[in-house]
């Protein structure tokens, strides 16, 4: 169970950082 909790916390942290950077300034990198 602890592995699940740590994995969830890791994903949540990465998600928060990603959204913070994403909303800080609009994406300028082309998808292709």
UniProtKB/Swiss-Prot annotation:
Location in or out of the cell: Plastid, Chloroplast thylakoid membrane
Keyword Plastid: yes
Keywords, in A-Z order: Chloroplast, Membrane, Photosynthesis, Photosystem II, Plastid, Thylakoid, Transmembrane, Transmembrane helix
Main location: plastid
Gene Ontology BP, a term: photosynthesis
Membrane-spanning segments: 3-23
A Pfam family hit: PsbT
Family: Belongs to the PsbT family.
Task performed by this protein: Found at the monomer-monomer interface of the photosystem II (PS II) dimer, plays a role in assembly and dimerization of PSII. PSII is a light-driven water plastoquinone oxidoreductase, using light energy to abstract electrons from H(2)O, generating a proton gradient subsequently used for ATP formation.
Record protein name field: Photosystem II reaction center protein T
Source organism of this protein record: Psilotum nudum
Name of the gene: psbT
């Amino acid at each position: 169970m602890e592995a699940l909790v740590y994995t969830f916390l890791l994903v949540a942290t990465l998600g928060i950082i990603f959204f913070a950077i994403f909303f800080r300034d609009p994406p300028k990198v082309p998808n292709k």
